[in-house]
Amino acid sequence: MLSEPELSQLTIRSAKKHVNMYKNLRISNIFCTFAAAKVKLIYIMLFESQIHDLKMWLPWCRIRREQSALRAIVEQQRRMMKPEDVASQSAQVISQIEKMTVFREAKTVMLYYPVHNEVDLRPLLEKYAGEKTFLLPVTHRRSMEVRPYDGEDMMRKGHLGVPEPQTPTYHGAIDLILVPGVVFDNHRHRIGRGGGYYDRFLSKHKATKQVGVCYSFQLRKHDIPHMFSDRRMDRVVTPLSTIE
């Protein structure tokens, strides 16, 4: 049996041992906390920009997905139009365009070659042949340029299957651009064919009046899916109305 001094000495040694264990544990916890903070800081530094990009990318994907769905529905409606309806409603759109001061005063007008029952503006090419220079788009892999229209004999199908002029590229000023589209809304937002050719081209000609052209069923009263960066038309023309 231990004497009282021996028992006292043992108690002191045990107490010191527990104190040292507590100190080591505390130091270990501090080190772990510091290490975790350091890892978190490195993570933020490395991935914060990617997280921001992801937050921006997700809404973009959702909007583009909604645009694609709406585009498919309206394109199907347009493809089902009867030829006589295309002709009569296109004539009404042309009548609306001819009323516009910007068209009457324009010397150089860019329009498009219609496909899949788009509004057909080709009668303008013949009617104003001696008064205005008409330009048609020519598409490349990722870009679009314009060339003067010089009759059907000078037209050849491009890589998208759309007839294009074989005349020299035009680099001068354009007074008016008549823009095709699949869907528009009353705030003049536009959903195009999906290739982005017009978006890129129009962004380089912001000073030029840009007028969207469509049938009445292609015009939505409420906002269609769009990004803040998407360019709005200056005006949208339908067979029965003009939206400004």
Predicted regions span which residues?
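Surface-exposed, charge/polar-rich loops and edge strands
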Residues: 46-65, 69, 76-80, 172-177, ...
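N-terminal active-site beta-alpha-beta segment that forms phosphate/nucleotide-binding
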Residues: 33, 46-164, 168-172
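Short hydrophobic alpha-helical segments enriched in small aliphatic residues
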Residues: 19-21, 53
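Short glycine-rich, flexible loops that bind phosphorylated cofactors or substrates
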Residues: 118, 185-186
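N-terminal, intrinsically disordered charge-dense segments
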Residues: 2-16, 45
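Short amphipathic alpha-helical segments and helix-helix/interface helices
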Residues: 122-126, 198-203
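Polybasic, lysine-rich low-complexity intrinsically disordered segments
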Residues: 16-17, 24-27, 38
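Charged helix-capping and loop-helix junction motifs
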Residues: 192-197
